[in-house]
UniProtKB/Swiss-Prot annotation:
One of its GO terms (cellular component) is cytoplasm. Keywords: Cytoplasm, Endonuclease, Hydrolase, Metal-binding, Nuclease, Ribosome biogenesis, rRNA processing, Zinc. It comes from Vibrio atlanticus (strain LGP32). Its cofactor is Zn(2+). This is Endoribonuclease YbeY. Its EC number is 3.1.-.-.
């Protein structure tokens, strides 16, 4: 099993961010359930970059917590490249505070959530959302975190 992380920190202030080891652990607890080897980029950004990408790719004129950009290899070519996760520091921090969650737990949840998107999971339809949230809860609890959706239940 090999999950290769390319961590990019595109923020003005790197203090208080999860460590590369934290992010690697979260990926190692998520991805191997679905595929043995993977390579992905996790880019932590400030509000401006998140806002710009969310507007350009999703038509939403605001920053968001996590954006997932799956990589699709051309037909006949097999690569372990999953894609890119773009996580907005300020949105994650604000959500953690608003939801009274430990900040590290919310960072972990965003990495798990985004990774599942890269693996093909979605939450547009209710049944898809239920399956994805169930997986997220299971993975988060396996790492010692609370159910990230506990406030919604």
């Amino acid at each position: 099993m090999s999950i290769e992380l390319d961590l990019q920190l595109a923020v003005e202030n790197e203090q208080g961010l999860p460590t590369e080891q934290d992010i690697q652990l979260w990926l190692d607890k998520t991805i191997p359930q679905f595929q043995e080897n993977a390579e992905l980029t996790v880019r932590i950004v400030d509000t401006q970059e998140s806002h710009q990408l969310n507007h350009e790719y999703r038509g939403k004129d605001k920053p968001t917590n996590v954006l997932s950009f799956p990589f699709e290899a051309p037909p006949g070519i097999e690569l372990d490249l999953l894609g890119d996760l773009i996580i907005c520091r300020q949105v994650v921090e604000k959500e953690a505070e608003e939801q009274s969650k430990p900040l590290l737990a919310h960072w972990a949840h965003m990495v798990v959530h985004g990774s599942l998107h890269l693996l093909g999971y979605d939450h547009i339809e209710d049944d898809e959302a239920e399956e994805m949230e169930s997986l997220e809860t299971e993975i988060m609890q396996s790492m010692g975190f609370e159910d990230p959706y506990i406030l919604e239940k």
